[in-house]
């Protein structure tokens, strides 16, 4: 498809690599290292820079910026010529898709006009099951087209959800809101974000966590202490 601005004729592109949320960072680093070795084995590739956790800082403005997460990584790839870059993209994309089936891997060239995907299709409706069925049918139609090299969707993997039985009359009598209960659960599990500090240009998040008397994570969620954020009277 044509865009308002064509892709830049440049000797560099970047590769987005995204594993499902919750994937160990060691797995991400290992896969990125093997991809880097593969790319450097190709004669048209001159240099590869790898980043884990997000888009490298102070990079450039003619590209998309990824949301920070330790399940994400990037490879910035330099080529001998723009022509070699363009000629090798389909072969490399096919290799990455075949060898890393658990990951979302996409090669992207630079463009003055940001576009997430060359072709996008959106379904809306109240029933997730119907939406998933329509998505699968549309994906199959696209995969049957030889000119299309990558088909994906924005459905994230289903994950367990912790639900709290909040009984408002009793909670109000002791001054506890839904937010108080939610923050206490967050502190006992992943940790409640309370700030950040910087190591150079890199921001590191700070979390407050509830622990037992021995400094260990609280195992029984029924025993989590809950405090109100409002001062007591």
What are these language model-derived features?
Residues 1, 27-113, 169-190:
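Solvent-exposed, membrane-proximal periplasmic/extracellular interface segments of envelope transport
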Residues 1-21, 104, 118, 145:
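Transmembrane helices with small-residue packing motifs
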Residues 2-3, 60-64, 118-120, 191-196, ...:
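Short beta-alpha junctions and helix-cap segments that line functional grooves
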Residues 10-14, 43-47, 70-74, 100-102, ...:
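Extracytoplasmic
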Residues 14-16, 72-90, 120-124, 204-208, ...:
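A short beta-strand structural signal in non-transmembrane regions
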Residues 21-22, 80-84, 127-128, 168-171, ...:
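Helix N-cap motif at beta-to-alpha junctions
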Residues 61, 117-127, 167-169, 208-210:
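Short, low-order "capping/linker" segments at domain edges
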Residues 132-233:
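Beta-strand-rich non-transmembrane domains
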């Amino acid at each position: 498809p044509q865009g308002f601005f064509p892709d830049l004729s440049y000797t560099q592109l970047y590769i987005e690599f995204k594993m499902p949320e919750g994937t160990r960072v060691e797995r991400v680093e290992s896969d990125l290292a093997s991809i880097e070795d593969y790319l450097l084995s190709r004669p048209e590739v001159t240099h590869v820079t790898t980043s884990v956790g997000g888009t490298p800082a102070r990079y450039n403005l003619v590209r998309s910026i990824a949301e920070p997460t330790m399940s994400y990584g990037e490879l910035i790839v330099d080529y001998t010529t723009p022509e070699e870059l363009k000629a090798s993209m389909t072969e490399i994309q096919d290799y990455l898709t075949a060898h890393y089936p658990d990951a979302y891997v996409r090669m992207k060239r630079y463009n003055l006009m940001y576009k997430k995907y060359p072709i996008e299709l959106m379904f809306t409706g109240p029933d997730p099951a119907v939406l998933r069925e329509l998505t699968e049918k549309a994906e199959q139609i696209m995969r049957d087209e030889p000119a299309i090299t990558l088909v994906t969707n924005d459905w994230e993997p289903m994950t367990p959800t912790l639900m709290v039985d909040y009984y408002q009359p009793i909670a109000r009598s002791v001054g506890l809101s839904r937010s108080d209960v939610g923050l206490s659960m967050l502190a006992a599990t992943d940790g409640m974000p309370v700030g950040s500090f910087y190591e150079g240009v890199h921001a590191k998040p700070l979390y407050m966590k509830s622990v037992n008397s021995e400094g260990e994570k609280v195992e029984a969620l029924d025993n989590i202490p809950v405090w109100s954020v409002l001062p007591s009277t």
